[in-house]
Design a protein with these regions (language model features):
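N-terminal secretory signal peptides
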Residues: 1-17, 27-34
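Eukaryotic scaffold repeat domains enriched in small/polar residues
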Residues: 39-337
Length: 337
C-alpha cells in the first residue's frame, strides 16, 4: 500500500485530540473491552481488546489531500452504499464501499464554524449537511450540487424557522421531519414532509423532555423519536406522533461501566430491535437492545486499528457494517457485526 493511498496508516500522522473539558470528564473512565458483535456476549471489563482483524476497513489519516481528514465530525451513507464524510475544514468527501475517494466539495461558508451532522435523506435522494454554526440544513444532490430551494433555516433566532446551533436531521416513514439544536435553548423541532414548521419542544435541563446538546436523532419503525441527549449522558425515547410529545423511556446514565454513557454523540437503530451508541467520552461503541440492556461493547482509547479516540458519529450500510468517525485519529473505521 502506497503512502498516497487514503487507506495507508502512518502512525506518525495519527494525532490525539485533547480537549480540556473532556480530559477531566473522561480521565480514567475507559475500560479495555472486547468486541462480541451485536449479539449477547461476555462483557467483562477484563476482556481482551478488539483484534485488528475485526476491523474491516480504515479510511483516511490526517491531512488536507483527497481521502484525508482534519478531525472528521459526521458521516452518512447513501442507499448505494456511498460514504460521505465531513471534517473540520468543511469538506464533504465521498467514497465508494471499498474506501476509494470519489469526489469532494466544501460548504458555502465556514468562517463561523463547521458542520457537526449529516444524513442521507432517501425521500428526496439528497445529502443533508447540518450546518451547525450557520443555523441551517443544506441539501445536496449525491454529486455535490447544492439545492438552494430545499434549505431549512439560515437565521439565528427563536421564531419558527429560526434556529440555534443545529445538530441533526431525521425523517419518519410518514415523511415527518425532526430537527435538533443546542446552545441557548436545546430543543427538537417537528416539520412536515414538505419542510413546513409544525411545532417544537424542549428546553435546557435534565428532566424528561429536556435536553443538553441533543446531538443525534433517529426514528424507529413505530414512529418513535430517539434522541441522543449527549451532555445528559442518556438516550430519550419520545412518542411525538400526536400533538403532545410523551416520554416513552430514558436509557443510560453517566459513567464508564457497560450500560452507562459518557457523551453519547451518535446512535443508530439496527434490525432485531437493537441500538448502537458511540461515546465521545468513553472512546467506545455499545450495542444495546431497545430496552437499554447491553449486548456488546467494543473500543479502547488509542490509535491502533480497532481503538478509538473521541468517536463523533456512526452509521450502518445495507449489510449492517458499522462505520465510526474516529475523530481524534482523523479516520473512519468500519467494523463487521
Amino acid at each position: 500500500m502506497q503512502r498516497n493511498d487514503p487507506l495507508y496508516l502512518n502512525p506518525s500522522d495519527r494525532t490525539v485530540c485533547r480537549r480540556r473539558f473532556l480530559q477531566s470528564a473522561s480521565a480514567g473512565l475507559v475500560s479495555a473491552l472486547g468486541l462480541g458483535g451485536c449479539v449477547p456476549s461476555s462483557l467483562d471489563s477484563d476482556a481482551s481488546p478488539l483484534p485488528s482483524s475485526s476491523v474491516d476497513l480504515i479510511i483516511g489519516q490526517r491531512g488536507l489531500a483527497d481521502g484525508r481528514f482534519q478531525k472528521p465530525r459526521a458521516l452518512a451513507i447513501s442507499p448505494s452504499d456511498e460514504l460521505y464524510v465531513i471534517d473540520k475544514t468543511a469538506r464533504v468527501q465521498a467514497f465508494d464501499a471499498n474506501g476509494k475517494f470519489l469526489r469532494g466539495w466544501k460548504t458555502p461558508q465556514w468562517a463561523n464554524g463547521k458542520p457537526t451532522g449529516m444524513t442521507f435523506d432517501t425521500k428526496t435522494n439528497s445529502l443533508v449537511v447540518v450546518d451547525t454554526h450557520y443555523f441551517q440544513f443544506l441539501f445536496y444532490t449525491p454529486d455535490g450540487q447544492l439545492l438552494e430551494s430545499r434549505k431549512i433555516g439560515g437565521v439565528n433566532g427563536t421564531e419558527p424557522g429560526q434556529f440555534g446551533w443545529v445538530t441533526d436531521f431525521a425523517r419518519a416513514a410518514d415523511g415527518t421531519i425532526y430537527l435538533s439544536e443546542y446552545g441557548e435553548y436545546d430543543r427538537i423541532y417537528k416539520y412536515s414532509a414538505d419542510g413546513e414548521f409544525i411545532d417544537r419542544m424542549g428546553q435546557h435541563g435534565d428532566a424528561p423532555l429536556e435536553f443538553s446538546r441533543p446531538q443525534s436523532l433517529a426514528v424507529d419503525e413505530q414512529g418513535l423519536l430517539w434522541v441522543a441527549d449527549s451532555c445528559n449522558h442518556r438516550i430519550q425515547v419520545i412518542d411525538w406522533r400526536e400533538s403532545q410529545p410523551r416520554i416513552v423511556s430514558i436509557l443510560g446514565q453517566q459513567g464508564p461501566q457497560v450500560g452507562q454513557l459518557q457523551f453519547p454523540y451518535a446512535m443508530t437503530l439496527l434490525s432485531k430491535d437493537r441500538l448502537l451508541v458511540s461515546e465521545y467520552g468513553n472512546h467506545r461503541v455499545q450495542c444495546w437492545d431497545r430496552q437499554g440492556n447491553p449486548l456488546s461493547v467494543w473500543g479502547t482509547a488509542g490509535k491502533e486499528p480497532g481503538q478509538l479516540n473521541q468517536p463523533w458519529a456512526l452509521a450502518i450500510d445495507a449489510l449492517e457494517r458499522v462505520y465510526v468517525v474516529d475523530s481524534g485519529n482523523n479516520r473512519v473505521q468500519r467494523f463487521t457485526l
